[in-house]
């Protein structure tokens, strides 16, 4: 049996940590590449591998949600968006995507709640909120009492 010195063991551990850290980044970048090339099954596999090494990577969950949106699997899309928001509560793209799902489901209360949250955090996609609220006002039942 080989005895390792503490120094050798420490180097071995650091190398493995280094490989895991940069390996997961490699999985994400490869997934992004596949996503841009519209190779969604391969992209999904890479994002899932990235999550194994980095379970708190909200962007991988967001891209999985985008893939499930394309595949029209709303249940998995919504699950990944919720996970994205658990990790990164101010992710405006995830909030916006959830608003669109809630609008499709005619869940007006959820759309309004998400819209309020969205207006507090939006930086890039602020105009999208206005469009959704306009759609909501066109669909929402009028009170004719």
Task: Show the residue positions of the predicted features.
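Structural marker of alpha-solenoid helical repeat scaffolds
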Residues: 53, 87, 120-124
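Canonical positions in the second alpha-helix
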Residues: 49-50, 83-84, 117-118
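Residue-level recognition of tetratricopeptide repeat
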Residues: 57, 91, 125-126
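Terminal, low-structured helical/coil segments at or just beyond the last alpha-helical repeat
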Residues: 112-145
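Register position in tetratricopeptide repeats
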Residues: 36-37, 70-71, 104, 135-142
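Canonical tetratricopeptide repeat
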Residues: 63, 97, 131-135
């Amino acid at each position: 049996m080989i005895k390792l010195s503490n120094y050798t063991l420490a180097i071995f551990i650091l190398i493995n940590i280094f490989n895991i850290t940069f390996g997961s980044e490699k999985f994400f970048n490869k997934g992004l590449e596949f996503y841009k090339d519209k190779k969604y099954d391969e992209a999904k596999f890479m994002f899932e591998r990235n999550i194994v090494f980095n379970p708190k990577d909200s962007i991988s969950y967001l891209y999985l949600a985008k893939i499930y949106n394309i595949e029209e699997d709303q249940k998995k899309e919504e699950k990944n968006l919720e996970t994205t928001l658990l990790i990164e509560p101010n992710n405006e793209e995830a909030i916006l995507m959830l608003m669109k799902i809630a609008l499709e489901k005619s869940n007006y209360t959820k759309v309004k709640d998400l819209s309020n949250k969205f207006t507090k955090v939006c930086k890039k996609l602020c105009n999208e909120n206005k469009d959704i609220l306009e759609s909501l006002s066109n669909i929402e039942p009028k009170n004719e009492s």
